[in-house]
From Swiss-Prot:
Species of the source: Talaromyces variabilis (Penicillium variabile)
Subunit structure: Monomer.
Pathway(s) this gene product operates in, as recorded in its UniProt entry: Secondary metabolite biosynthesis
Family of the protein in this entry: Belongs to the zinc-containing alcohol dehydrogenase family.
InterPro entries the record matches: ADH-like_C, ADH-like_N, GroES-like_sf, NAD(P)-bd_dom_sf, PKS_ER, Trans-enoyl_RdTase-like
Protein name: Trans-enoyl reductase pvhC
EC number from the UniProt entry: 1.-.-.-
Keyword Zinc applies: no
Length: 358
């Protein structure tokens, strides 16, 4: 536990020019109510981290979402999840949030409400744990709340459905493929051919080359023009157009991870579009600019708590596994390089992870 005379730490924080930097005088988060203080052992860089620039940057707010670490201190109301000091945990927090500026993953210490924490089994390292949070939280929100897919992991649907995950080699993609298989469904996916074996190892029943001009026809044939659900992990206008074209004649549901194109949505009224923002699963206010602003949502927090409980059971039973990693040296000092590599699209089929400290 940090000494109470120690109230500052090293952390990656926002700057006044819309960028970020490593500071050595950031405050350690205060612990109250159901919050838990965690000594960070590893962090991973996610696409959302690379997008928080300009108006999405709050000066001096701590950045970062995905982390793993050791429980250092429990708030007085953190009594419902069986956590104790010394437990190995991982999850995601909302970094660069004006409504909660002292909390972010890219720091020596972070803090989270107890019910969003995943307990790491002995078989999973801190580095692997740092890849789990935002991917599995976002996938659960997208699949089982936004799309409303029947069944749940540990409670499989009675009738398997063929479901498309566009971008299956992404971290959200591999998480979604596993969750769909555990929910009793038949996941198919698109990715580059060099990632076919990867996505199949995570549960894809079949994989299609998104660059092949015949892929849309192949998927329509594969699904007998009856595809009802599509999760778009790439979330561009072109990926949305692809998903809209392969959803079956009777229509269905489409969910992306970024705001979708209203113009594409107008092309098929029988398809119901939605988009989700993974950090909103915590139910807290996220004070980013529109359209990413989220008010406090207790109903969403309840879903988040229930979903985290499911993930904890899946981890305990070793039914889900982490995304592949690129482990990099340098800790917090090298976060900027990871962000730049993501922006330059230099990373495919792996998540950048930085171990911190000893």
């Amino acid at each position: 536990m940090p000494s109470r005379t120690q109230n500052i730490q090293s952390a990656w924080i926002g700057t006044t020019d819309g960028g970020s930097r490593l500071a050595h005088d950031a405050p350690i988060p205060a612990i109250a109510r159901e919050r838990v203080l965690i000594k960070t052992k590893a962090v991973s860089v996610s696409p959302v981290d690379s997008k928080l620039v300009g108006p999405y940057v709050t000066p001096n707010a701590v950045a970062g979402f995905d982390f793993s670490g050791i429980v250092e201190e429990l708030g007085p109301e953190a009594t419902k999840c069986g956590l104790k000091v010394g437990d190995r945990v991982c999850s995601a927090v909302v970094g660069m949030n004006p409504a909660d500026p002292t909390i972010g993953a890219f720091a020596e210490y972070t803090a989270a409400v107890e019910w969003i924490l995943l307990k790491l089994p002995p078989s999973i390292t801190f580095e692997q744990g740092a890849t789990l949070g935002i991917s599995f939280l976002t996938s659960g929100l997208a699949l089982f709340r936004s799309l409303g897919i029947p069944g749940r992991p540990l409670e499989p649907a009675p009738k398997p459905l063929c479901i498309l995950v566009y971008g299956g080699s992404s971290s959200c993609g591999t998480a979604s493929l596993q969750l769909l298989r555990e929910a009793g469904h038949i996941p198919i996916t698109t990715c580059s051919p060099h990632n076919f074996e990867l996505v199949k190892s995570y549960g894809a029943v079949d994989a299609f080359d998104y660059n092949d001009p015949d892929t849309m026809d192949k998927i329509k044939k594969y699904t007998k023009n009856g595809l009802r659900y599509a999760l778009d992990c790439i979330s561009t206008t072109s990926s949305m157009q692809f998903c809209y074209k392969v959803i079956g004649r009777a229509g269905g549901k489409y969910t992306s991870l970024e705001p979708f194109s209203a113009a594409v949505a107008q092309t098929r009224k029988v398809v119901s579009p939605d988009w989700v923002m993974g950090p909103s699963l915590l139910g807290q206010e996220v004070a980013w600019p529109e359209p990413h602003y989220r008010k406090q949502d207790d109903d969403l927090a309840q879903f988040g708590a229930e979903w985290t409980a499911t993930l904890n059971q899946l981890l305990k039973k070793e039914l889900i596994k982490p995304h592949p990693m690129q482990i990099r040296d340098g800790g917090l000092e090298n976060i900027q390089q990871g962000l730049e590599d993501l922006r330059a699209k230099k990373v495919s089929g792996a998540k950048i992870v930085y171990p911190l400290g000893s």
